[in-house]
Amino acid sequence: MPLNLRHRHFLRLMDFTPTEIQFLLDLSANLKKAKYTGTEQPRLKGKNIALIFEKTSTRTRCSFEVAAYDQGANVTYIGPSGSQIGHKESMKDTARVLGRMYDGIQYRGYGQELVEILAQYSGVPVWNGLTDDFHPTQILADFLTMLEHGEGKRLNQMKMAYLGDARNNMGNSFVEGAALMGMDLRLVAPKAYWPEQKLLDEVAEMAKKTGAKITCTENVEEGVKGVDFLYTDIWVSMGEPEEAWEQRINLMKPYQVNKALLEKTGNPKVKFMHCLPAFHDENTTVGKEMAQKYGMNGLEVTDEVFESDASIVFDEAENRMHTIKAVMVATLGQ
């Protein structure tokens, strides 16, 4: 491979250079093509991979498992109730045990410091499948999807608006990704939900080098004008008190992605993205409860937009697997 990322961890995007991120995206596209054409070569044969999930998941777990199987690796799934991490055994000790048995470890859980401890003490590549602070594998999938639907534009020629809760792990990772790849990113959210200033300061130098433009605004019209992509995420997380839901939903209502908001972009070819799961209809227990309680047509996005031709959310979901495969092959492959 032209770049050597072997034995590197994948904990957050700012640990990499723009060239390295582009390399991972190019590798993802090549691996995707190989899978579709039946020409994929297994480069993880004989490797054993541990998947630690302290938070449940559909896309991340399936992506890591299918990617590993495609490449000839074996996986062990360690679910939220399947380990002693933090209860009877520290992450430091867990890292030193698993590092003796496995060639690579994925972690999806809470504090960023936990995945960093795992990386520090395991002695094998560690991949961040999501923490409270960052979700780097999702951003890789998003960037690949944007390149596929960007009509030939490079990332540094693209404009994207991220609406809703921009202080979460997705907002944080988009800030890092946009800075690295020279993008025009608008974080369109209530001021209380803008990213921490500390993070914006951290990426400022990189953004200057790449020509990235990162803007925080409460003004929906200004934020979405002329963008190529509209992106949102769920407004509330399971486990938060119900009072927090009501307050958050009322605050976020102006940032819902609906048909009127798409029209405000002035771009008839604008695309809609979402990392999923999405509360767009009443076909889930939570979605039905939210619709009845708040009288809304969807929460962060309406069903009309979610099911429209503008929506590329399922291309995006598929690309989780191809980009995760690229990360594992680049850092662990033979």
Swiss-Prot record:
GO cellular component terms listed in the entry, alphabetical order: cytoplasm
Enzyme class: transferase
GO BP field: arginine biosynthetic process via ornithine; citrulline biosynthetic process; L-arginine biosynthetic process
Catalytic activity: carbamoyl phosphate + L-ornithine = L-citrulline + phosphate + H(+)
Top-rank lineage group of the source organism: Bacteria
Binding site for carbamoyl phosphate: S57, T58, R59, T60, Q84, R108, H135, P136, T137, Q138, C275, L276, R320
This protein's pathway: Amino-acid biosynthesis; L-arginine biosynthesis; L-arginine from L-ornithine and carbamoyl phosphate: step 1/3
Family, similarity comment: Belongs to the aspartate/ornithine carbamoyltransferase superfamily. OTCase family.
Protein's name in the database: Ornithine carbamoyltransferase
